[in-house]
Amino acid sequence: MPGRDPRHIEAEYPIYPRKMWEPYKSRREEHGVQLYGALGIGRSDAQARLAQYKRNFEFFNAPVALFVAVDRKLGPGQWADLGGYIHTLMYLARGYGLDTCAQESWGRMYRLVGEFVNMPPEQMLFCAVAIGYGDHAHPANGFRSPRAEPSEFCKFFGFG
């Protein structure tokens, strides 16, 4: 992808809503500021930010990657099931000493990937999952995104 900014390629589905609203907009922005800050990349350093984003398409140097697709006719419930499957796969890999990274950014590369893997037309690329041995000393791997308090997004009933 030399000379091409993959952030401007549309995925087949919206990875994020076109107009993010609060509190999600602020949370997403804060996550970006903190992650790129941990990497020593300033907000105004567009070239370094793009270079870091492009590392997605090298699977962050992982030796193995999976492309995950979903049948185009399936709806939100099945997409939730797919997320659960991916999550389980990632936990299982961890049990074998492997690290993983789910990469929805690959959804933007659906044409390239579809052609490369000869994906049937009824399938839609959802994401990739990089699998390997993480560099735990890398600042991105020590970074933890801020978390909202559970009381901000859920209610518990029937618990003491």
What is each model feature region?
Residues 1-160:
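Acidic, surface-exposed loops and disordered segments
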